[in-house]
Curated annotation (Swiss-Prot):
Its main location: secreted. This is Sulfhydryl oxidase 1. Its EC number is 1.8.3.2. Highly expressed in roots. Residues 295-397 form the ERV/ALR sulfhydryl oxidase domain.
Length: 528
């Protein structure tokens, strides 16, 4: 019995201790916890007293209003996401002040109960969108008609919320955007290229989406062009998930596009449809650009990302692949780039090349020179029409501060380039820098993106491009395409791609990319 009495005594003592733990004590612990995080809130906390006045006096064009409860674990977990977006628009360091007012109301506080009832809050968190003055004296109900206050449906992550806002106001804001005053100074910063891997994935997916939207693969010629570009991506795209997605499309291509006529069926049950493939994974596109984001919604973006993709491909090929890469890039732009004037101008520059490329250096320098010629032409047009990006004017690249050794001499009208130094710079900037600087400064992006990018940005292993006959002989002898075997759905599919000369002839392929993917991770580290 004495043991039972001891347990009862301990229970009473614990109850007394719990009772003595006052709300003030809990508040102290809360303060200690918050001091650990010590993060400044950018979202404006509203209550029943200041609600109308804050919205009435706001100069912002739009507002987001979050209703939450401080006791709600989901609300606490969501707060960092909401704050990521709020820092763009609110506070002294706002990147885009005066565009969107980010606010929140705690429904767990008694004075706010009636306010929350006016908006029919039945779960937490719940987000609303409207011009600020519409919230003044406003209310919302699920059965109300013609209410300018609308519910935000896509909000669960910072990315989703910002993408939703972008759609509402036709913007292209990104979570990592800086103040515009800092952007121009950073354009020549080598470390900025570390963000371009995300833009390369974005541009790859957007190019694929454009092909789907325009149903652009409609003949054996366009089919062959698409296949060649896929082969180039499988071998040398700097993102692993884009290499994987490209390979999956490539090996299923004869089912998707028999006789060069592709299926674009949108029905979920249509297995043999291009729309069922994600060339860079299901998480892409994200809906915004980073390195390539312009100061205006209509500038830079996709075209910039496509250029970065082509440059990154050009510095990853080997000598024997240079002509194949040149043909693949030129044909892809000619068949699938929908800006007609740009397409024709680029095609003319491709046609001006009379001698086949033999060295990887040659294709990298040709693409660099071509890009500068395009910039010169566009700069004249944009300066005369006022259509350029004031924060990112077209320039001869690289600027001297980015690569002083690239310049032998320069005047206002002419530059004498050191092409050896330019090539070294291109290799480093679009190759090594695309990986190493990002890994060094990975804290600047979200944890999820760091984890993904650490895997995605490994430089692909060496690839070999050989004539069709030799490729078939090697395939028969050594079962090449070993690494792609994991993507082959059946052994029959493998034989169709590796052993069937009629299949290859059907697309008039002069060369075949043979990417083994068989190097170890330690070998990839050496390549970096």
């Amino acid at each position: 019995m004495s043991l039972i009495h001891l347990f009862l005594l301990l229970g009473l003592l614990s109850l007394e201790a719990a009772a003595s733990f006052s709300p003030g004590s809990r508040s102290i612990l809360r303060d200690i916890g918050s001091n650990v995080a010590d993060q400044k809130d950018n979202a404006i906390e509203l209550n029943a007293t200041n609600f109308d006045s804050v919205f009435q006096d706001s100069p912002a064009k739009y507002a987001v209003l979050e209703f939450f409860a401080h006791w709600c674990p989901a609300c606490r977990n969501y707060k960092p996401h909401y704050e990521k977006v709020a820092r763009l628009f609110n506070g002294a360091d706002a990147v885009y002040p005066g565009v969107v007012l980010m606010t929140r109301v705690d429904c767990a506080i008694k004075m706010n109960v009636k306010l929350c009832d006016k908006f029919s809050i039945n779960h937490y968190p719940m987000l609303f969108w409207a011009p600020p003055k519409r919230f003044v004296g406003g209310s919302w109900g699920p059965k109300q008609e013609k209410n300018e206050i609308s519910v935000v449906n896509e909000w669960r992550t910072a990315d989703l919320l910002l993408n939703w806002i972008n759609k509402q106001i036709g913007s292209s804001y990104g979570l990592d955007d800086q103040k515009l005053g800092n952007l121009l100074s950073n354009i020549s910063d080598q470390e900025q290229i570390s963000q371009a891997i995300f833009d390369i994935e974005e541009a790859t997916e957007e190019a694929f989406d454009i092909i789907l939207a325009h149903k652009a693969i409609k003949s054996s010629e366009t089919s062959a062009s698409f296949i060649r570009f896929l082969q180039l991506l499988v071998a040398h795209h700097p993102s692993r998930r884009c290499r994987t997605g490209s390979a999956e499309i490539l090996v299923n291509f004869d089912d998707i596009c028999p006789s060069g006529e592709c299926s674009y069926d949108q029905e979920s049950g249509a297995k043999d449809s291009l729309r069922n493939f994600h060339i860079c994974g299901k998480d892409v596109p994200r809906g915004y650009y980073r390195f390539c984001r312009g100061s205006k919604n209509e500038t830079r973006g996709f075209s910039c990302g496509l250029w970065v993709l082509m440059h990154s491909l050009s510095v990853r090929i080997e000598d024997g692949e240079s002509q194949f890469a040149f043909t693949a890039i030129c044909d892809f732009i000619n068949n699938f780039f929908m800006c007609d004037d740009c397409r024709r101008h680029f095609h003319d520059m491709c046609l001006s090349v009379k001698t086949p490329f033999k060295k990887a250096r040659d294709i990298a320098l040709w693409l660099w020179s071509t890009h500068n010629k395009v910039n010169e032409r566009l700069k004249k047009d944009e300066d005369s029409l006022g259509t350029g990006d004031p924060k990112f004017p077209k320039m001869i690249w690289p600027p001297k501060q980015l690569c002083p050794s690239c310049y032998l001499s320069s005047t206002e009208k002419n530059i004498d380039w050191d092409h050896d130094q330019v090539y070294k710079f291109l290799k480093k900037y679009y190759g090594q820098k695309l990986v190493s600087v990002y890994k060094k400064n990975g804290e600047s992006v979200s944890k999820e993106e760091v984890i993904a990018a650490a895997e995605e940005m490994a430089v692909p292993t060496n690839a070999l491009v050989v004539p069709v006959g030799a490729a078939l002989a090697i395939a028969l002898a050594s079962c090449a395409f070993g690494a792609l075997a994991c993507y082959w759905r059946t052994q029959q599919k493998n034989r169709k791609y590796n052993y069937n000369p009629h299949y290859l002839k059907r697309y008039n392929s002069n060369y075949m990319v043979m990417n083994t993917f068989s190097n170890t991770e330690s070998e990839r580290e050496k390549e970096r």
